[in-house]
Swiss-Prot record:
Domain of life: Eukaryota
Signal peptide bounds: none
Motif range (Responsive for interaction with TGA factors): 106-109
Cysteines engaged in disulfide bonds, as pairs: 22-25
Family statement drawn from the similarity comment of this UniProt entry: Belongs to the glutaredoxin family. CC-type subfamily.
Gene: GRXC13
Name the record gives this protein: Glutaredoxin-C13
Keywords: Cytoplasm, Disulfide bond, Electron transport, Nucleus, Redox-active center, Transport
One Pfam family per UniProt: Glutaredoxin
Glutaredoxin domain location: 2-108
Organism: Oryza sativa subsp. japonica (Rice)
GO cellular component annotations of the record: cytoplasm; nucleus
TM segment ranges: none
Main location: cytoplasm
Length: 109
């Protein structure tokens, strides 16, 4: 499963793993859309292996036990895990998100 998540996370400059109906997932994807980022979005509750991918994302976010909070949204920029909602929003407020998106080739501004 780790290889599958890594492959999907590298398919575009920005990849977001979400669940439909998740308000925090909507907040992150809306922010990226407003920044004119065309992210690949994978809704885990609509994927055949979504539960397994969610466990892998939780492991990546919170360590080997995979416990510590929700696994979605999980945001990857340039193939690297950035984090979840709080990390992405904090980076945006500090002015760090746009430069990271530019470096990954997700923005052409």
């Amino acid at each position: 499963m780790a290889e599958m998540v890594a492959r999907l996370a590298s398919e575009r400059a920005v990849v977001v793993f979400t669940k439909s109906g998740c308000c925090m997932c909507t907040a992150v994807t809306t922010l990226l859309g407003e920044l004119a980022v065309s992210a690949a979005v994978h809704e885990l509750d609509r994927e055949p292996l979504g539960k397994e991918m969610e466990r892998e994302l939780a492991r990546r976010l919170y360590g080997s036990g995979g416990r510590g909070g929700p696994a979605v949204p999980a945001v990857f920029i340039g193939g690297s895990l950035v984090g979840s909602t709080s990390k992405v929003m904090a980076m945006h407020l500090k002015g760090e998100l746009v430069p990271m998106l530019k470096n990954a080739g997700a923005l052409w501004l």
